[in-house]
């Protein structure tokens, strides 16, 4: 082990953590929102975690890839309970060994899977790069509620249009996260960091929202009258229902589901968002076959 050069310190820390044994799940944790903070190395994940906790709970260094996973850490803010699922970060392969890369990626992916809400951190100075897209893409593929958190906002030269320009750039680069809210912060100065937690509460509520079947079908039927299914008049969506939350998942029953184009389903998703919100939450739409008795 070399403390100066960081040689083998990752393995040492892992050995120390293992001595603690598995963390026990407290009954109070049931009501807590589990938050995973993800992003590329040195984007400010550890600084944000420490700012939330008000202490140096996570090891921080200027050298990318030196943060090690902490045990899940519960904390409270404004009467609400949270659990931070800390991550090792997804590192560039050129900077670390292949074995350590695989190890850190697996731990990050597991953290995402265990989270209720994921904070996708970006660097305001460097902007969106390919590594950010890959991380955000995985969060989206896992259908996890998420917030895009742009850190180091204090280092950006600003004018009246700066935030609008950043919004446009991020939306262009991360088109698949059009539903995700944006928050600009400085983890170092703690500017707006607790606004992030307020947004976490909101997004978690949106992600667990359930819509009554009658209300749902009224909205969908009106949307289909305004913009009917293209193609054959024989193709019909008969009704829909919500089968789960987190993420909100809807089943649409059609007499010929194979003939319903994905662009029309995207239209229906936009209708759901316009009427019911679901901000920060992915939506899953499923088509199933049900024969029309009128046929």
Residue spans of the language-model regions?
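C-terminal-of-GTPase-core extension/linker across diverse P-loop GTPases
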Residues: 1-85, 93-106, 110, 114-120, ...
């Amino acid at each position: 082990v070399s403390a100066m050069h960081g040689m083998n310190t990752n393995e040492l820390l892992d050995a120390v953590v293992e001595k603690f044994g598995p963390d026990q799940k407290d009954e109070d944790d049931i009501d807590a929102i589990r938050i995973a903070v993800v992003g590329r190395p040195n984007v400010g994940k550890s600084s944000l975690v420490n700012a939330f906790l008000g202490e140096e709970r996570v090891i921080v260094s200027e050298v990318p890839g030196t943060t090690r996973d902490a045990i899940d850490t519960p904390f409270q803010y404004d009467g609400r309970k949270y659990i931070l699922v800390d991550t090792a970060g997804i590192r560039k392969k050129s900077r670390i060994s292949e074995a350590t890369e695989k190890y850190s990626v697996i731990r990050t992916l597991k953290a995402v899977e265990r989270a209720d809400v994921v904070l996708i951190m970006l660097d305001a100075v460097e902007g969106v790069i390919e590594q950010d897209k890959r991380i955000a893409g995985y969060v989206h593929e896992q259908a996890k509620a998420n917030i895009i958190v742009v850190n180091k906002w204090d280092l950006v030269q600003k004018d009246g249009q700066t935030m609008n320009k950043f919004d446009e750039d991020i939306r262009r680069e991360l088109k698949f996260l059009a539903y995700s809210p944006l928050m600009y912060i400085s983890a170092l100065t703690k500017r707006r960091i607790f606004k992030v937690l307020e947004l976490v509460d909101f997004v978690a509520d949106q992600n667990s929202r359930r819509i009554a079947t009658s209300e749902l079908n009224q909205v969908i039927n009106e949307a289909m009258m305004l913009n009917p299914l293209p193609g054959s008049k024989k193709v019909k969506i008969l009704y829909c229902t919500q089968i789960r939350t987190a993420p909100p998942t809807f089943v649409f029953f059609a007499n010929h589901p194979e003939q319903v184009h994905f662009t029309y389903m995207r239209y229906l998703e936009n209708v759901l968002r316009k009427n019911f919100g679901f901000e920060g939450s992915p939506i899953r739409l499923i088509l199933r076959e049900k024969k029309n008795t009128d046929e």
